[in-house]
Amino acid sequence: MDIKINDFTLGNNSPFVLFGGINVLESLDSTLQTCAHYVEVTRKLGIPYIFKASFDKANRSSIHSYRGVGLEEGLKIFEKVKAEFGIPVITDVHEPHQCQPVAEVCDVIQLPAFLARQTDLVVAMAKTGNVVNIKKPQFLSPSQMKNIVEKFHEAGNGKLILCERGSSFGYDNLVVDMLGFGVMKQTCGNLPVIFDVTHSLQTRDAGSAASGGRRAQALDLALAGMATRLAGLFLESHPDPKLAKCDGPSALPLHLLEDFLIRIKALDDLIKSQPILTIE
């Protein structure tokens, strides 16, 4: 099943779409500068692009951690991004009352992994009529995503994207099961599946309030996932990851974006140039 977002198609057999940007809005200037680089690179490489950022990181481990600019200021920044670059925008919501105002500005709204089973939030998101990106919870198997999809269908919205972001592997670690991408496609009606490589790289030191990360392995993991014929890649970058206010250890240094995407696009083009081979 393909989904139309602005002037491009998101589907598992179509050229991949990049959901890229920054983890959390830090300021208007930094947002526009980062987005400008994404736009320049993706247009040069011919990659369909959706800008991603959070206005509020509502699930930080510490109450003292930076959360973002908030809903009102965040929507103003998203409006400026759309006006300046003419691109679609995706952001996440955490409470039902946020859904409608966000949907009026953003083209795709995202259901956070930790909240994916919250029925009131699911229904509120569905009622907006917007495309919804569902993050697969770390504690849920790929096949159980079907239950969340059915909630959205019952609430009247079938414009859904499924997003892998790693599964809990013991304490303080995540792994990505490459077989899970196919399972989600098969059990959820071949909805578009994308891969959040950034958050799949997270680790955590025992007792730490901040997430660690393995960005040195970002390309390896991204290539492995994209080899399974995916609709898109979810990627966060930062001009200086050491200064990022959230998830810097997992963020791709912004100056490496073009070289990174050249390799991703080459693999995606190769995979999708071949007919699908079904093995029963």
UniProtKB/Swiss-Prot annotation:
It is found in: Cytoplasm. Pfam families: DAHP_synth_1. Pathway: Carbohydrate biosynthesis; 3-deoxy-D-manno-octulosonate biosynthesis; 3-deoxy-D-manno-octulosonate from D-ribulose 5-phosphate: step 2/3; Bacterial outer membrane biogenesis; lipopolysaccharide biosynthesis. It catalyses: D-arabinose 5-phosphate + phosphoenolpyruvate + H2O = 3-deoxy-alpha-D-manno-2-octulosonate-8-phosphate + phosphate. The keyword RNA-binding does not apply. Its EC number is 2.5.1.55. This is 2-dehydro-3-deoxyphosphooctonate aldolase. It comes from Neisseria meningitidis serogroup C (strain 053442).
